[in-house]
Amino acid sequence: MKKQKTTTQKPKLSYRINEQIRVPEVRIIFPDGTQQVMKTIDAKRLAEEKNFDLIEVQPNADPPVCKLDNLGKLIYKMDKRDKDLKKKQKTTTLKELRFHPNTDKHDFDFKTAHLEEFLRKGNRVRATIVFLGRSIIYKDRGLELAERLTERLSCVSNRDGDPKFEGKKLFVYFEPDKKKVDAFERIKAKTGVPQQPLAPLPPSEDIEE
């Protein structure tokens, strides 16, 4: 029994399909990726013979580009992609740790290790350098610290823009880089040395947004 075409289905996409396509000719993209320019009437006939929908995906091209595909499946793929994207956005958290322009090496290493771990887990991070009292006169130290952070975290992230002063605070943002993280994890795995869990941060230090 021949499968019923989906021309009566109300599409969620803004594409023209089947009889809605009225241009003289179109460029067809076949399921195997090959392409061919043909008269629209022939393309519609071909779609019907192969039990596909003719879906216009690039209306402004010359000639317009159409795909031979099942509209229902295409909508499902688009919906799944959107849901996966929303899910990923929901699980991404902005984590923040605070530093001072005179942060000592031990504190710097400890907090930077936590920032690195946050990034490896896919979180954005913000390093906030706080200038207390008259320490604001040492802005250059804050900027130097921002560069040290950038260098230290470059193995798993990219800095998002330049460090930005707001009042007596200097903000530095970092975005996780999946390729860098994957490469970092591979190198870690090759060492064969089990990674020890980090000591927990004080409650006042672990900030989420």
Curated annotation (Swiss-Prot):
Cell location: Cytoplasm
Keyword Isomerase included in the entry's annotation: no
Subunit-level organization: Monomer.
Role: IF-3 binds to the 30S ribosomal subunit and shifts the equilibrium between 70S ribosomes and their 50S and 30S subunits in favor of the free subunits, thus enhancing the availability of 30S subunits on which protein synthesis initiation begins.
InterPro entries registered for this protein in UniProt: T_IF-3_C_sf (IPR036788), T_IF-3_N_sf (IPR036787), Translation_initiation_fac_3 (IPR001288), Translation_initiation_fac_3_C (IPR019815), Translation_initiation_fac_3_N (IPR019814)
Key word tRNA processing present: no
UniProt signal peptide: none
GO biological process: ribosome disassembly
UniProt keyword annotations, A-Z: Cytoplasm, Initiation factor, Protein biosynthesis
GO CC, any one term: cytoplasm
UniProt GO MF annotations: ribosome binding; translation initiation factor activity
Protein name: Translation initiation factor IF-3
Entries under NCBIfam families matching the protein: infC
Family: Belongs to the IF-3 family.
